[in-house]
């Protein structure tokens, strides 16, 4: 059994220049592995809690307290445990914290240890992480949901929708899907320049032009897809992350595109978009606590498009189970730092798949060079991954890892393609 011998931690910087936690785990057999923890910009109220230092250092965003939690409390609790006993290790972490939202030790401290333990166990077993976590049948390469126009909390513009994504569903392989996405991305830059629009980048590597609204952004992307020699819809479909919680006020409604709208009016807006554009997925179209609106929206258009719960579910099995019972959404966004351990993440994915919900593995806007989520996407067979534009090394690192995995799988590799979106029919677009 690969026994945990050492646990270390340090404060490093993420892609936004903010501190985050990196954990190193050493085993008795000499294996050493590390994991770095991401951080979000638009965070759900129900997420597990990051531990930040406050004060003036790093403008209050330091993580020395989380590092101390790893060194002083977590390390003594897990040293001597088997790294291949992931569920036991993660339960020990949850029990040690003792709070429902991991606020005592910090989800950033706990997750760093959880992931580093899994990576060390895989390395000790001489298995790639995707194979160690996913077993012998892990072979599905996900569709890269590339965020090529950034708005909302990811950019300083007037665009309310947070992410405009492309999904290269018609590609024959992940390698080709990545090429198509990169070509559309560069094509979009040329389109923006020709129209005199800004080509500065948002947090996730997408362009951040100031546009009049959602349709203008979708039209620009459609033009870029065609300019790249690809077909809008059958080759490259479109997707949104609205992040509606960011512009929702209880009792007032949704302050969206210079109007105050009800959930019903937002639903009508999305229905109109579906008639005009080949959208395969809409994430967080309504606020995280607007359960009635979610249920009505799912009943209205859930048979036509993937409706993804991010802030709604926060990768939490309890909230997901509630949503399944209510009939809210039909897909789960998977962010490991929302729940705080690998075991709980895998439990949420299993619950979603068993209920017929799709899953999309996801990065955060504050990322590092850590590529764990690329392996997890293949391990759980999510068929979709959201990890930014094909630009900025913290985003590209995940795509490059998926290229390596596809190459390692060889003839056994299968690219999810349009099978990842069974509700989408290009003939109707």
Curated annotation (Swiss-Prot):
Protein residues bound to Mg(2+): 241, 283, 310
EC number: 4.2.1.11
Presence of keyword Hydrolase: no
Active site feature: 204 (proton donor), 335 (proton acceptor)
Cofactor note: Binds a second Mg(2+) ion via substrate during catalysis.
Record keywords: Cytoplasm, Glycolysis, Lyase, Magnesium, Metal-binding, Secreted
GO annotation terms (biological process): glycolytic process
Compartment(s): Cytoplasm; Secreted; Cell surface
Catalytic activity: (2R)-2-phosphoglycerate = phosphoenolpyruvate + H2O
Paired cysteines (S-S): none
Function according to Swiss-Prot or TrEMBL: Catalyzes the reversible conversion of 2-phosphoglycerate (2-PG) into phosphoenolpyruvate (PEP). It is essential for the degradation of carbohydrates via glycolysis.
Listed name of the protein: Enolase
The organism of origin for this protein: Mycolicibacterium vanbaalenii (strain DSM 7251 / JCM 13017 / BCRC 16820 / KCTC 9966 / NRRL B-24157 / PYR-1)
Lineage: Bacteria, Bacillati, Actinomycetota, Actinomycetes, Mycobacteriales
């Amino acid at each position: 059994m690969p026994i945990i011998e050492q646990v270390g931690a340090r404060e490093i910087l993420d892609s936004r220049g903010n501190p985050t936690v990196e954990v190193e785990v050493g085993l008795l057999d000499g294996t050493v592995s590390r994991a770095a923890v991401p951080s979000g910009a638009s965070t759900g109220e129900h997420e597990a809690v990051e531990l930040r230092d406050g004060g003036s250092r790093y403008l209050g965003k330091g993580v020395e307290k989380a590092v101390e939690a790893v060194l002083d409390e977590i390390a003594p609790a897990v040293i001597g445990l088997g790294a291949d006993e992931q569920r036991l290790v993660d339960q020990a972490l949850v029990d040690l914290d003792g709070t429902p939202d991991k606020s005592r030790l910090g989800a950033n401290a706990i997750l760093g240890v959880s992931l580093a333990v899994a990576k060390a166990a895989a390395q000790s077993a001489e298995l790639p992480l995707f194979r160690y976590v996913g077993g012998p049948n892990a072979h599905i390469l996900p569709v890269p949901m590339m965020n090529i126009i950034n708005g909302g909390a990811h950019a300083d513009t007037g665009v309310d929708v947070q992410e405009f994504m492309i999904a290269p569903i018609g590609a024959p392989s992940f390698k080709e899907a990545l090429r198509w996405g990169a070509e559309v991305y560069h094509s979009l830059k040329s389109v923006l320049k020709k129209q005199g629009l800004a080509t500065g980048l948002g947090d996730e590597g997408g362009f951040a032009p100031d546009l009049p609204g959602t349709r203008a952004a979708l039209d620009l992307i459609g033009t870029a897809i065609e300019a790249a020699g690809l077909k809008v819809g059958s080759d490259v479909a479109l997707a949104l992350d609205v992040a509606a919680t960011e512009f929702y006020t209880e009792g007032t409604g949704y302050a969206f595109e210079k109007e105050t709208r009800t959930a019903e009016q937002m639903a009508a807006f999305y229905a109109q978009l579906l008639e005009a554009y080949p959208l395969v997925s809409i994430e967080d179209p309504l606020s995280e606590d607007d359960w009635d609106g979610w249920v009505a929206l799912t009943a209205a258009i859930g048979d036509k498009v993937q409706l993804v719960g991010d802030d709604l579910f926060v990768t939490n099995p309890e909230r997901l189970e509630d949503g399944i019972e209510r009939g809210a959404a039909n897909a789960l966004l998977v962010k490991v730092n929302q729940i705080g351990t690998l075991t709980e993440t895998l439990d949420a994915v299993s619950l979603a798949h068993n209920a017929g919900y799709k899953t999309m593995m996801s990065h955060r806007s504050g990322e590092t060079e850590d590529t764990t989520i690329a392996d997890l996407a293949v391990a759980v067979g999510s068929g979709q991954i959201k990890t930014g534009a094909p630009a900025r090394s913290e985003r590209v690192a995940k795509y490059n890892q998926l290229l390596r995995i596809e190459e390692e799988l060889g003839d056994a590799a299968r690219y999810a393609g349009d099978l990842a979106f069974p509700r989408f029919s290009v003939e109707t677009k």
